[in-house]
């Protein structure tokens, strides 16, 4: 493993034996890396991390390079635990046949310091749906909180047993010609996806690690158990009526308990509800303003407005009813228009 940008980190995993065309390393690597962002766009610059796979020869005295996979850690910033499957690229594609192997990597990133506001570069990965595939290559990502890189080891073969995401692992599998035809060909998933693989860079937010909601459901929690309702026959009519009344009262009490029983909402629905509660409803504000206004017709307001006055020679002027008193009596006469 080698960090090409944003720092200097090199590491080697332990040597493992190939079993059933698969290799499981189950190793975890942690290191710090520095990412810069464009001042104009805020998009993170590429931060390449290379994982190369080698095969020992001559009893460990020599080795052959099977291939490598370059991971742009900037694509995973802020995505929490992300799993990526990569097809190994060959070093010498002209003279050497490329190895048919898939590397599975789990990436977890944590923001240690710096500005938490940034944009991830567009993903260069591809998502290939497979019919009958039980494990989705494009699952909801998990949020995290910090910027440290953890590297682990996972299984990359279609036939081998699956490794849980918590056991971050690097894996590399070699498939035969028949197995390669039957293998689960998986491309790169998006930077927001979470497959099962090996290193992880997270800029964790509020989402809890491991919470993957698939829908909104309301689950009714168990309420307090109600007492069994029994009505024993009684020869006395008064006692029978009392028993029936008690039974009805218990039924009403049980229904009230069920009504008061709290309903546990899914995390997504509860988060949306909390966000809506903090927002001001514009319709309510407009309704309050309309209710506070008086739109009734006031006749007295019309009489106190401007009036038309006509003076000698046909001159006109506008003013209130105090205008004749100011300009002198007889100078202007009020014009009255009857409706």
Swiss-Prot record:
Tissue specificity remark: Expressed in bone marrow-derived macrophages.
Region of interest called Disordered, as start-end residue ranges on this chain: 226-262
Key words, A-Z: Phosphoprotein
Modified residues (Phosphoserine): 197, 255, 267, 299-300, 329
Iron found in the keyword field: no
Pfam families the UniProt entry points to: NT-C2
Compositionally biased intervals (Basic and acidic residues): 249-259
Domain C2 NT-type: residue ranges: 1-111
PROSITE patterns referenced in this protein's UniProt entry, alphabetically: C2_NT (PS51840)
Top-level division of the source organism's lineage: Eukaryota
Bias (Low complexity) ranges: 230-248
InterPro entries: EEIG1/2-like, NT-C2
Protein family according to the UniProt entry: Belongs to the EEIG family.
Protein's name in the database: EEIG family member 2
């Amino acid at each position: 493993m080698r960090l090409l940008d944003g720092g200097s980190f090199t590491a080697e995993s332990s040597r493992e034996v190939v079993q059933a065309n698969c290799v499981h390393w189950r190793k975890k690597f942690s290191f710090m890396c520095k990412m810069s962002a464009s001042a104009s766009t805020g998009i993170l610059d590429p931060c390449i991390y290379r994982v190369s796979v080698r095969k020992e020869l001559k009893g460990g005295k020599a080795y052959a390079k099977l291939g490598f996979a370059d991971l742009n850690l900037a694509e995973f910033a802020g995505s929490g635990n992300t799993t990526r499957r990569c097809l190994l690229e060959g070093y010498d594609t002209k003279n050497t046949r490329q190895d048919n192997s898939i590397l599975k990597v789990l990436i977890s990133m944590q923001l240690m310091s710096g500005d938490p506001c940034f944009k991830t570069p567009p993903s260069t990965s591809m998502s290939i749906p497979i019919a009958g595939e039980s494990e989705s290559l494009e699952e909801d990502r998990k949020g995290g909180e910090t910027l440290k890189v953890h590297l682990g080891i996972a299984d990359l073969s279609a036939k081998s047993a699956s490794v849980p995401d918590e056991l971050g692992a690097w894996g590399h599998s070699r498939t035969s010609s028949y197995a390669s035809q039957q293998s689960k060909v998986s491309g790169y998933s998006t930077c927001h996806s979470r497959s099962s693989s090996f290193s992880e860079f997270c800029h964790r937010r509020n989402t809890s690690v491991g919470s993957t909601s698939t829908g909104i459901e309301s689950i009714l929690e168990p309420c307090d158990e109600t007492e069994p309702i029994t009505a024993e026959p009684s020869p006395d009519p008064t006692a029978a009526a009392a028993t029936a009344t008690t039974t009805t009262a218990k039924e009403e009490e049980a229904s009230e308990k069920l009504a008061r029983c709290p309903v546990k909402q899914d995390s997504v629905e509860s988060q949306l509800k909390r966000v809506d509660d903090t927002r001001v409803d514009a319709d309510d504000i407009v309704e309050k303003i309309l209710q506070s206004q008086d739109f009734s017709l006031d006749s007295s307001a019309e009489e106190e407005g401007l009036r038309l006055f006509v003076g000698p020679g046909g001159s006109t002027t506008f003013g209130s009813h105090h205008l004749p008193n100011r300009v002198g009596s007889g100078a202007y006469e009020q014009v009255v228009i009857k409706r």
